[in-house]
Amino acid sequence: MKKNRLFSAALSVLLFIGIGAPKAQAQDYYQAPPLNPEFEVLANQVVTLNLDDPEGANKAFAKLLKKIVGKKNDLFAVGDYFLKNNAYSAASQCAKKITDEMAGEDVNVYMFKGEVYMKGKQWGRAGEEYEKALYYDSTYVPAIRRNAFVYKNINPDAALDYLDKLQRIEPENFRVNKDKGDIYYKLKRRDAAIENYQAYYKSAPKDSTVLDFNSCQQYVLSLFEAQEAAKVGELSTEMLQLWPNAMVFKRMRFLADVDTYDLDAAAEHVSYIVNQEYPDSSYKYLDYFYAAKLNELNNELEPAIEYYKKALAVDSTQALAYKDLSNIYSQNQQAELGLETYKKYLEVIGDKADLSDRFFLGRRYVAVYQEPGVDPEKKQQCFDEANKIFAEVMEKKPDFIEVYIQCARLNNTDSSVANDTVKNYYLKVIEMTAETPDEYKRQRLEASKYLFFYAINVEPNDMQLARRVLDIAAGINPNDKFVQQATK
């Protein structure tokens, strides 16, 4: 007796997993046969008794099962009743009693069994049942749809094949493009995702009850990743007509404004950040990063600094924000903060740092060295460190013109005295740019001016050098004030 009660209790648990949950929505994937009124009474009794009398429910189920076993249509109809009332295990037992021999060529039975397995999240077994339906009717749309759904997470290529098949049968079904776009998006196949989302958005009614919000969001995000800023702005504006409070579309519209340098529109659309329209936790790194960019483009350095700091507070792994913040600090006469922030940038990128990163670190040291009020000892340290870094860059990339310019400027510590070290750096610039003078006019003009100064101030004067570099400067810009004064 005790054993039987334990079995009954276990059976009760199996039979009624899911009872008490909201009723499943009826689907159009299959058509069940009519339910015999006698069996409907028993099935309803099984469902209602379970809450107060599990043992009675089990007896009712056993009685019902005994009456319908071996009868395909009755097993199907009763199983459908249990499935629609979320009695998954009871529905499953009915489905299992219907053998393939009993089902024969009845695609509705295979679809029902597939839905039972779907309810139990047995995706592979569900797919097998849908395949059986397709074996008997290769164009059976419900089976194609469900297989596409089943496979989209476990075998996306198979899902795409089913969707292609469905598209050939239903070429006007815009949801097929939506589903294909979703799969390609998940696979990170951006161009294919955009192509399908574009077809979906073009064909679907512009109605928020029809269009899928997540797919529209992924469409815009894919375009943003593809750097289609103008299209991002256009679509985000349209989608805000459908979902006026959707933060993602306000964000993407604002980002597009900044990327297209539409600063007036950006100043208007940044309001969702400025006015704190959403909870703090809703704002992402890109919100603050682009707000910083907008202020930077408007030469509003202090607000830009604050937004960069907010961006990094959200995501401290974003190297670009450290680099850009370092630049802003330097522009804002905060060179020491610029140097420390640039070091943080190098720390974040780690082994990805290249020679250009080292070069710009040298420039940050130069900025601190040149900033008024810096402690003399620190000033000297920055001078030495900058020269050391520039020497390293020269050694590894001897054809990098700009590093010679920077070294010349750094070592020109007294502009009233002719300096051999500075002269040699500028001579190197003239020499290295001789074959491509038009590409380096600015650098050659700067070098020529210093070399002329050096030539007429060194003892004895080097008039040959003076004439040579004056000719170079005159060839670059005969109206330059230096050229006009030197030729008098």
Language-model regions, residue ranges each:
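Bacterial Sec-dependent N-terminal signal peptides
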Residues: 1-32, 208
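Residue-level marker of intrinsically disordered, low-complexity segments enriched
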Residues: 11, 15-17, 107, 139, ...
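Alpha-solenoid helical repeat scaffolds
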Residues: 27-459, 488
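Alpha-solenoid helical-repeat scaffold
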Residues: 458, 462-467, 479-482
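Eukaryotic acidic, Ser/Thr-rich intrinsically disordered low-complexity regions
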Residues: 473-474, 479-488
